[in-house]
A protein has these predicted regions:
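Conserved ABC ATPase signature
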Residues: 55-60, 64
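ABC ATPase "signature
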Residues: 141-142, 150
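Short helical segment in ABC ATPase nucleotide-binding domains corresponding to the A-loop/adjacent helical element
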Residues: 17-25, 35, 39
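Conserved ABC ATPase "signature" region
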Residues: 32-51
Length: 172
């Protein structure tokens, strides 16, 4: 399983390339394949490997650091990616860009993603299934459209009340 945390947690003394290749190296993947994977992943998020592979995290913007954290999480091709509020500390422009990136990664790499968020707009945008919990108990699991149109109870209805203005096409 790959994971991306709210705090990016790149190793400051390691280059971008070293950060991304860390897990594949720990799994004893072929060195040539690791290099190819790092380059391919950087290109997939519009970061030129020649420009970024040897940079240190201190030389990156917050959004770039988060992209590298995501790439590190998927570099060893996990079947499941856990993302725990990864964009909560980012500015709106970076957040939107990274949300779009997550959708692209999900589609391109076919990785099941468990995305933890308190941002209902984010849940509606990114999820094909949403699990609403209260006090550690599951209240409803459904598609975004089903959650909006048929909330299980008042808690779910109120939780998503502001989202009712969103057109179904935006989150389907």
């Amino acid at each position: 399983m790959g994971y991306v945390l709210q705090q990016i947690a790149l190793f400051p003394n390691m280059t971008v390339g070293e950060n991304i290749s860390l897990i594949p190296e720990m799994k004893k993947m072929d060195k040539k394949k690791i290099k190819e994977t790092v380059d391919r992943l950087l290109k997939s998020v519009d970061l030129d490997p020649k420009d970024y592979k040897n940079r240190l995290p201190e030389d990156l913007s917050g959004g770039e650091k988060q992209r590298i954290g995501i790439l590190r999480a998927i570099a060893a091709s996990p079947k499941v990616l856990l993302m725990d509020e990864p964009f909560s500390a980012l500015d709106p422009i970076s957040k939107t860009s990274l949300q779009d990136l997550i959708k692209k990664i999900h589609d391109d790499f076919k990785i099941t993603t468990v995305f933890v968020t308190h941002d209902m707009d984010e849940a509606l945008k990114l999820a094909d299934r949403i699990c609403v919990m209260k006090d550690g108990k599951v209240i409803q699991i459904a598609s975004p459209t089903e959650i909006i149109n048929n909330p299980e109870n008042n808690f779910v209805s109120e939780f998503f009340d502001n989202e009712k203005r969103i057109n179904d096409e935006q989150f389907s």
